[in-house]
Design a protein with these regions (language model features):
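Active-site-adjacent structural elements that line small-molecule/cofactor binding pockets in enzymes
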Residues: 1-158
Length: 158
């Protein structure tokens, strides 16, 4: 089962997983029979300037999802529900940069693993390693060939 990327660790654990468990039980299945796959937001890069640019891309993606009324529940879970209509209004005006600017550092770090490349795997495993069986990188920015290979290797070992 693919879990939506617009999630946080606490939303996944407190809202999504219990809903999956209820659905599994209603169908006579155990939660353990359902493999979860998560596209996790990741902000990383080889230096501070690259990380800042990559963070801007992830902030924009979070803002885009946050503008969608059906995803307001994730924001409300963290006390950010009032941001949703503002993001929605800005999206209708095509103000994409302004939308991303509304995603502060606390929100960014709640939605995304923000880490140097050598710490990304540990960040993902620490948040999601005990609840998802597969993970992909939701990283809306370019990286050089082979960039993700050591991170993938560490995740496979973890």
């Amino acid at each position: 089962m693919l879990v939506h990327g617009f999630t946080t660790e606490s939303y996944l654990r407190e809202i999504t997983i219990p809903a999956i468990e209820r659905g599994a039980a209603a169908g006579g299945r155990e939660r353990s029979a359902i493999e979860l796959s998560l596209p996790a937001f990741v902000v990383t890069g080889p230096d501070e300037a690259t990380m800042a640019a990559n963070a801007a891309g992830v902030r924009s993606q979070i803002a885009f999802y946050g503008s969608t009324p059906n995803y307001r529940g994730v924001l409300e879970h963290h006390g950010w529900g009032d941001l949703q209509p503002e993001l929605n209004a800005l999206s209708k005006e095509g103000k994409w940069v302004e939308m991303g600017n509304l995603i502060d550092d606390d929100m960014l770090h709640t939605f995304a693993v923000v880490a140097e490349p050598t710490e990304v795997a540990a960040g993902i495993l620490g948040r999601f390693g005990d609840v998802v069986q597969r993970v992909s990188f939701y990283a809306p920015y370019a990286t050089p060939a082979g960039f993700w290979a050591p991170i993938v290797a560490e995740l496979q070992e973890g």
